[in-house]
């Protein structure tokens, strides 16, 4: 009985920690519009809790899409070096003041519209950066944590300004997340 009560209490805490079912992202630039993301709290509870906390604090507002590879994905979320108006030369190298989150790999496939957490070569290094898939990328399956899916606005995602070269670095003025709101 104690385990049942403790489990219910932990589940209730986890639900209030994340406190969200999605994100509303208002994108500006070559792409203009709103993207709705359904967060998969049951798949990646720690990652969802971290990104919703960052979103609720306004950390993602004004952050650019710094790495965008045609036919693959658009990456954003560098709240340290990726803010509009800053020196974007280091965009993609930073994170938040929060600790990195351990990997929460799942069997959810990387299909078009799936949202995953960016990380370094260390699987336990995801922090604030995430990416949205333009197309399927099943070679990522089980290698990167899935946190959500686009439910509305994939056409807006598909219009995000593309980067150049093999690394997809965006030259000039990148598109950005003007406002990111946690939805219930």
Language model regions located:
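Cyclophilin-like peptidyl-prolyl cis-trans isomerases
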Residues: 2-7, 15-184
């Amino acid at each position: 009985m104690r385990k049942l009560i403790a489990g219910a209490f932990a589940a209730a805490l986890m639900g209030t920690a994340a406190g969200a079912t999605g994100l509303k992202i208002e994108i500006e630039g070559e792409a203009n519009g709103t993207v709705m993301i359904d967060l998969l709290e049951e798949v990646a509870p720690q990652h969802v809790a971290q990104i919703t906390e960052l979103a609720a604090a306004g950390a993602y507002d004004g952050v650019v899409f710094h790495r965008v590879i045609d036919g693959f994905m658009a990456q954003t979320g560098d709240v340290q070096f990726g803010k509009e108006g800053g020196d974007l030369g280091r965009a993609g190298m930073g994170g938040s003041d929060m600790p990195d989150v351990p990997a929460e790999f799942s069997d959810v496939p990387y299909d078009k519209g799936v949202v995953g957490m960016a990380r370094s070569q260390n699987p336990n290094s995801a922090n604030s950066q995430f990416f949205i898939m333009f197309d399927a990328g099943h070679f990522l399956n089980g290698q990167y944590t899935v946190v959500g899916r686009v439910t509305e606005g994939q056409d807006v995602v598909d219009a995000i300004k593309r980067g150049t070269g093999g690394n997809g670095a965006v030259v000039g003025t990148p598109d950005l997340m003007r406002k990111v709101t946690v939805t219930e």
